[in-house]
Amino acid sequence: MNQVRKWNIIGGRVIKTGIAVFLTVLVCEFFNIPTIFAVITAIVTIEPTATDSIKKGLVRFPASTIGSAYAMTFTFFLGHQALSYALAAMFTIVTCQKLRLHAGTLVATLTAVAMIPITADHYFTAFLIRLATTSTGIIVSTVVNFFILPPHYVKTISGCTEELFVKTANVMEEWLTALMDGKVIKKETTYNLSKLTVLLHKAVQFVQYEQKDWKYHRHTKKEMRSFLLVQKQLHLLQQIIYHIDNLARAPIETCDWSQNEKEILRRTIHSIISILRNHCEKIDEEHFKLIDELDKQFWTNKNDLAHCKPNQYHHHFSSESIILFEILSIHDMLEELKQIFEKYESENQLNCSVY
């Protein structure tokens, strides 16, 4: 898998950018207008989603118009001087920010400063030509992004979700080792947990991308159910990772477990790890028995703590109670994941029987 990623250097967006640039140049040559500004606009208009291409294209056009207008105005009054470049850039940035054209600020500023050295006269004509080239770049890129290799992230999201299940289980396993040793977790575990969070955010971002373009593409009922499944799975995995992060911060070294408590805890966490690696498709009865034991243990610890006097213990939860609470919370998420998967499977079977 890593090997595939390593050599997959040309993605869909790279190919679409090349196609957009090629078509933009052809259109510009056909109408006999300059290509460079159209190409710059075409390159930056290719976005992760077709929706973003349309929205940001509508922002970049007026922004580029502003940049072109400032460039021609200052060149007309000041000529090709350093002050013309500076004023054109400054006024373009300020105006775009004031008008909230943030997505078009960079392109507009580049357009403004690039126009100055290549325009000697006929400033208004140059301004109109710039509008034409900018429009060409935006329209061509948007059409390419919409119709050629349209963005589909469902497979990517599913891959990220599967990876999250496995890596979440791995981090839990690393944390269990530290717990059994009664030592602070290793830096490597903390690093793996941070990578897990990054992967989660990446998957959530892909979900947002897919949702934006959902209305533009046809989907079967099965595809819609699959997308909703991974969306719900990611939401619950996010909560599980949150609880694991709390476990990583819990003061393991202050815990005082009996041998029996430690063994139940070890078996329960091993069971959780196994369930995660199987994507929560099945939870056996033995796991529920272990959870019942942990639940009793949690309330026993909580009640014992309530009898402590304030001068003896000033926290509402002991280290043991915190760890037990987080593990029980993770179990709740696992149950929800199992129910979601069972519902998905039953709907698929029902759909197959209908057809």
UniProtKB/Swiss-Prot annotation:
Matching entries from PANTHER family are given as: MULTIDRUG RESISTANCE PROTEIN MDTO, P-HYDROXYBENZOIC ACID EFFLUX PUMP SUBUNIT-RELATED
Give any Gene Ontology cellular component. plasma membrane
Which UniProt keywords are given for this protein, alphabetically ordered? Cell membrane, Membrane, Transmembrane, Transmembrane helix
What family does the entry list?
A: Belongs to the UPF0421 family.
Q: Which InterPro entries match?
A: ArAE_1 (IPR010343)
Q: Membrane topology per the record?
A: Multi-pass membrane protein
Look up the signal peptide feature and give its range.
none
Which compartments does it reside in?
A: Cell membrane
Q: Which organism is it from?
A: Bacillus cereus (strain ZK / E33L)
Name of protein: UPF0421 protein BCE33L2478
Q: What residue ranges are annotated as transmembrane?
A: 19-39, 74-94, 109-129, 131-151
- Superkingdom, taxonomy of origin: Bacteria
